[in-house]
UniProtKB/Swiss-Prot annotation:
Ca(2+) 2 binds at D57, D59, S61, T63, E68. GO terms for molecular function: calcium ion binding. It comes from Euglena gracilis. Ca(2+) 4 binds at D130, D132, D134, Q136, E141. The lineage of its organism: Eukaryota, Discoba, Euglenozoa, Euglenida, Spirocuta. Keywords: Acetylation, Calcium, Metal-binding, Methylation, Repeat. GO terms for cellular component: myosin II complex. This is Calmodulin.
Amino acid sequence: MAEALTHEQIAEFKEAFSLFDKDGDGTITTKELGTVMRSLGQNPTEAELQDMINEVDQDGSGTIDFPEFLTLMSRKMHDTDTEEEIKEAFRVFDKDGNGFISAAELRHVMTNLGEKLTDEEVDEMIREADVDGDGQINYEEFVKMMMSK
């Protein structure tokens, strides 16, 4: 998992890790994990932190070593990239930038992608993703649709 990180990212993570490894023994406590991640621009909730700690801290020692930390951060970085890609895709579909994808916008983009859809097919796609029933797709609905694929 950690192979997906660049040398610069690994160096940055090592520097942050070292700042919180107070006694220099090569481990940080689970309590400090949140502080480290926030210093690197991540914003995990308490529940997310607990989940991450449970995943990484196999022996229940309450500490995380650097290889475990790298694995954790590469997962978080991957999640962030995915979210950014979804935002970018939403912007492509949302031609007028109003925060919603209309049937006309969906049809336009799908046609440009080489997908010749009937009005019924476009309406069906909108209906499937349109949780609140307003006839268009907002960002939250788009994310749900993309994540369910």
